[in-house]
């Protein structure tokens, strides 16, 4: 039986997108520096991602006065030259875009490299029907102050077609610098893991979410067991397709 996310490890503050080929987006969902998904990616609990493995991964960071600098708050996905899609619940009280920056092309959370680009944020758009209690419509868009140039380590993800449906047990990949424990520290190196879409009737069972997960949400996990259930509702996942992600 599957568990939600990894059972022994769960990632907080990570947001993901379906990696789907969408003709409306044009050139997207490609990983120039990585030829194929490595077979060893199927590791329960996740592991360090290869440099450039997820070139749309973004670290959304907020300036903390008490720290005297920026701190990673949550992940996002680059969807074009100046827009990052993330979860609305990450923003919390920090709705002023001047507090934020987007770090793109990042691998080590605390060490930027030659491929890294820092962008300040022009505007933050939160879904008008976002509900904090149920996580319905948990989507937000960060509009960047400058245009980002694509390279082998910075690429946009493809958005899913509105009519696309993910089948149960469809394989997806997740990535981020999330914490292993609720009060733990963020991971230094970008993490990745393989998960499967879990049927809603399992997630909505009496022992788990008791019907609180709607059909607009996605439940995903591993095959290692069902003894622990941790999930962020309406996260986004990376799903390989024929022509890209």
Say what each PLM segment does.
Residues 30, 37, 42, 60-63, ...:
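Conserved H-D interstitial segment of serine endopeptidase catalytic domains
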Residues 48, 111-116, 133-136, 151, ...:
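Gly/Ser-enriched beta-turn/beta-hairpin loop segments
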Residues 113, 126-131, 147-187:
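Active-site substrate-binding loop(s) of clan PA
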Residues 48-53, 78, 94-96, 132-135, ...:
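Extracellular/periplasmic catalytic domains that process cell-envelope and extracellular macromolecules
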Residues 34-43, 57-68, 161, 170-245:
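Extracellular trypsin-like serine protease catalytic domains
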Residues 1-85, 106, 233-236, 240-245:
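Protease-domain processing segments flanking chymotrypsin-fold serine proteases, especially trypsin-like
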Residues 84-88, 136-161, 189-190:
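Conserved active-site neighborhood of the chymotrypsin/trypsin-like protease fold
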């Amino acid at each position: 039986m599957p568990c939600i996310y990894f059972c022994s490890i769960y990632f907080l503050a990570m947001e993901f997108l379906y990696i789907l080929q969408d003709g409306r987006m044009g050139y997207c969902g490609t990983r120039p520096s990585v030829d194929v998904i490595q077979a060893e990616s199927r590791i329960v609990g996740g592991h360090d991602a290869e440099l450039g493995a997820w070139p749309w991964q973004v670290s959304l960071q907020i300036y903390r006065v008490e720290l005297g600098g920026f701190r990673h708050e949550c992940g996002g996905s680059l969807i074009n030259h100046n827009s990052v899609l993330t979860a609305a619940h990450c923003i919390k009280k920090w709705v002023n875009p001047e507090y934020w920056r987007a770090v793109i092309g990042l691998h080590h959370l605390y060490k930027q490299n030659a491929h890294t680009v820092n962008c300040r944020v022009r505007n933050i758009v939160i879904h008008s029907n976002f509900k904090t209690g149920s996580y319905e419509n948990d989507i937000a868009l960060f509009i960047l102050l400058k245009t980002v140039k694509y390279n082998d380590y910075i690429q946009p993800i493809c958005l899913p077609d509105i009519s696309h449906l993910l089948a149960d047990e469809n394989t997806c990949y997740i990535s981020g610098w999330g914490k292993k424990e609720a009060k733990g520290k963020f991971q230094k190196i970008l993490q990745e893991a393989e998960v499967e879409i879990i049927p809603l009737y399992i997630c909505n069972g009496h022992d788990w979410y008791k019907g609180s997960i709607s059909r607009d949400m996605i439940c995903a996990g591993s095959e290692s067991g069902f003894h622990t259930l941790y999930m962020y509702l309406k996260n986004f996942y990376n799903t390989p397709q024929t022509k890209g992600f």
